[in-house]
Amino acid sequence: MILRCDKMDRLFNLSQLHKNASSEDLKQGSFGIEWEGLRVRENGELSLSPHPEIFGNKLSNPYITTDFSESQIEIITPTFDTIDEAFSFFSFMSDLVNSSLDDDEFLWFQSLPCILPDSSEIPIAKYKGRELAEESMEYRKGLAKKYGLRKQLISGIHFNFSFKEELLEKLYENLDISEIESDEDSRISYKEFKNMLYLKISRNYIRYVWLIIYLTGCSVAAHDTFTPECTKLMEHSDNRGGVYSERGPSFRNASCGYKNLVHLYPSYHSVEEFTRDVQSFIDEGHLSQAKELYTQIRLKPKDPSDVLSSLRNDGIQYLEVRTLDINPFYKCGLIKKDMDFLHLFLIYTLIAEESDYENWQEEALYNEEMAAEAAYDFNMKLLKDGEEISLEEWGLRILDEIDDMCRTLGIGSRSLIDSMRQRIADPSLTYGKGLIRLIKEEGYINSQIKLSKINKITSKYLLENTDLLDDDRFKEYVPIALQGAKK
């Protein structure tokens, strides 16, 4: 069943959510974090050593593995019922990883890479021991050939989210079909209902992702060994091999970021249309497989080995938000209040009214890239249904609506929303502007290595001088995460 936007708004809106969901229902969910980051040497060069033995087999370690490169660590949390639990686990696991690296090796707390060697020397992640290993390596070789090795080293944070099944079941049971259908005998299945809910979130997230990019963006600089496609967009040199821009907060999300070679716009009106479109992209040679579709938010299936069939048969299980830059100003590269806001933002995308503007995806991509590359330009304008609007005006309007939603539903905090308002009213309070000030003073590589050292010292101190390793929340995970440790 496919519903028009106006009917979807009648199905998912603030009144319906307030009537059928408690604040506790909405505060809980299934939350997970995936964090990618490079290993670097003290001089700011990419570490070319193999994945540390202490973490064991990449394919069997569920929490610490590699992403594209052998030099690119990925931390993966299990799912938790609250953001507090997910963030605490992730922060601990980050401490564990950072403290386990050799003394002359550090995590690079930037989404854009460090000093890179010749492309031929960048090590693709090596896998062995399972049938999946060869397939994983071949897939990565294909990406390297298609997009270039340097671009593969762009790193970021993924936030996995779904509502609790109990809440979804409650919303489904209280569904008033007369709101959307004249045929009283018709009935949407539970799977269809979930799909509709997550698809509406996805559509609105894509429409408004520019706001998340502005509020959390922190990739304003690169080293000149990175791809010229990106460095040419950065108008300043730090005279130490680094380049940076004062125009926008997130070149990871900019036009030069990690994106498909051509713009691909699958339908988000139904799972059937989405999977049909993605399959056509594969058939036409734009994608090698479904997971090569790079979007700001992904529909995640029950069976990741057969994405399209599982989405059709099992429905959408959860959403993966892929927008967040690594933040160097906190020891694990992520700040919890940004996660709290992102959670509220996702709830907002469910209840926000939708527009029937035909070219909404093209417009959303324009806004995404303009916010990423030029949000600090006072004259920059976004597009809303074809009409120009300032980022400040639109952003504050959205935050007012989120504030109203939070008051009605009894979630969130006024101080959290106010802090986001302040970032819009005063760009100097954004992470990107803070990073620009640091780079002007110390240079890109020097400033980021200094932060990497501080973060490593902080992580080691916490593990050595607190009870974290014996904390009941974490201690059962340590031998699994450090499965390669010598006994």
Describe the function of each predicted region:
Residues 48-51, 87, 120-121, 171-172, ...:
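Short conserved micro-motifs at the rims of enzyme active sites and ligand-binding pockets
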Residues 18-20, 133-149, 153, 162-313, ...:
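Loop-rich catalytic cores of soluble enzymes, especially ATP-dependent carboxylate-amine ligases
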Residues 113-114, 222-229, 362-372, 418-426:
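A glycine-rich phosphate-binding loop feature that marks nucleotide/adenosyl-phosphate handling sites
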Residues 414-487:
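Extended, compositionally biased alpha-helical segments that mediate assembly or anchoring
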Residues 312-313, 319-406:
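Substrate-recognition/cap regions that form aromatic- and gly/pro-loop-enriched pockets
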Residues 2-131, 135-144, 151-155, 200:
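Terminal catalytic/cofactor-binding subdomain
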Residues 36, 149-164, 318-325:
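Histidine-centered divalent-metal-coordination microenvironment in nucleic-acid enzymes
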Residues 130-137, 315-323:
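Active-site-adjacent bridging/hinge elements
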